[in-house]
From Swiss-Prot:
Its main location: cytoplasm. GO terms for molecular function: rRNA (uridine-2'-O-)-methyltransferase activity. It comes from the Archaea. The lineage of its organism: Archaea, Methanobacteriati, Thermoplasmatota, Thermoplasmata, Thermoplasmatales. The active site is at 151 (proton acceptor). Pfam families: FtsJ. This is Ribosomal RNA large subunit methyltransferase E.
C-alpha cells in the first residue's frame, strides 16, 4: 500500500473500470449501512463522472442522476443536466419520474460538492448550502420510510444541519469511509426512515 490513499484508490478504480475512486466510498457506505437496497428507485445528485452511478446501477431498479456537468451515458440511467439551485429542477425531476412511472423514490443520495477553495470555513459553508438543497429535494420526493445519504465538509454548522433535518427521519448516522483522505474534513451523513407528512 502506498502512503497516499489517493494513489491506492485511483489505481484500484482504473483496474475495476470504475469512473472515479468515489465509487469505493459508496460501496463502503452501502455495505455497512444499507442506505440503498436491491430494487430501490434512487435520485442521485452530483453524479458526474459516474462512479457512484455505476455502483448504484448494480443495485437499484431505477436511477435518476443529476449533475451540472455532462455525464457519459450509463445504460438504464436517466440523466438530467441541471443546476439543483434552479427552480426548474423540480419540473425536470417531476417529468423524469412521471415518464419512468415512479411516484416517489426510496432513496436520495448525493456526492455533490463545489470545487474546493482550500479555505475550510468557506468550503464548509458551501457544503452546508448544497446539503440544504439536497434535503429540500429529498423531502419532496422520498416515500415514507425512505433514506438520504449526502456528503458534507464537517464544520461548525454540521450539528445545526443535522438538528434541522433529523426530526423528519427515524435516525441518522455519520461516517467517513476509508477511501476518504485522512486529512479531509469530508464526512457522509445518512438519514434513515423518512417520516412523510
Amino acid at each position: 500500500m502506498t502512503g497516499d490513499r489517493r494513489d491506492e484508490y485511483y489505481w484500484k478504480a482504473k483496474k475495476e473500470q470504475l469512473r472515479s475512486r468515489a465509487a469505493f466510498k459508496l460501496e463502503f457506505l452501502l455495505d455497512r449501512y444499507r442506505v440503498v437496497r436491491k430494487g430501490d428507485a434512487v435520485i442521485e445528485i452530483g453524479s458526474s463522472p459516474g462512479g457512484w452511478t455505476q455502483v448504484l446501477n448494480s443495485l437499484a431498479r431505477k436511477i435518476i442522476s443529476i449533475d451540472l456537468q455532462e455525464m457519459e451515458e450509463i445504460a438504464g440511467v436517466r440523466f438530467i443536466r441541471c443546476d439543483i439551485f434552479k427552480e426548474t429542477i423540480f419540473d425536470d425531476i417531476d417529468r423524469a419520474l412521471r415518464e419512468e412511472g415512479i411516484e416517489k423514490v426510496d432513496d436520495v443520495v448525493s456526492d455533490a460538492m463545489a470545487k474546493v477553495s482550500g479555505i475550510p470555513s468557506r468550503d464548509h459553508a458551501v457544503s452546508y448550502q448544497i446539503g440544504q438543497r439536497v434535503m429540500e429535494i429529498a423531502v419532496r420526493y422520498l416515500r415514507n420510510g425512505g433514506n438520504v445519504l449526502l456528503k458534507q465538509f464537517q464544520g461548525d454548522m454540521t450539528n445545526d444541519f443535522i438538528a434541522i433535518w433529523r426530526k423528519n427521519f427515524s435516525s441518522y448516522k455519520i461516517s467517513k469511509p476509508p477511501a476518504s483522505r485522512g486529512s479531509s474534513s469530508e464526512i457522509y451523513i445518512m438519514f434513515f426512515g423518512f417520516k412523510a407528512p
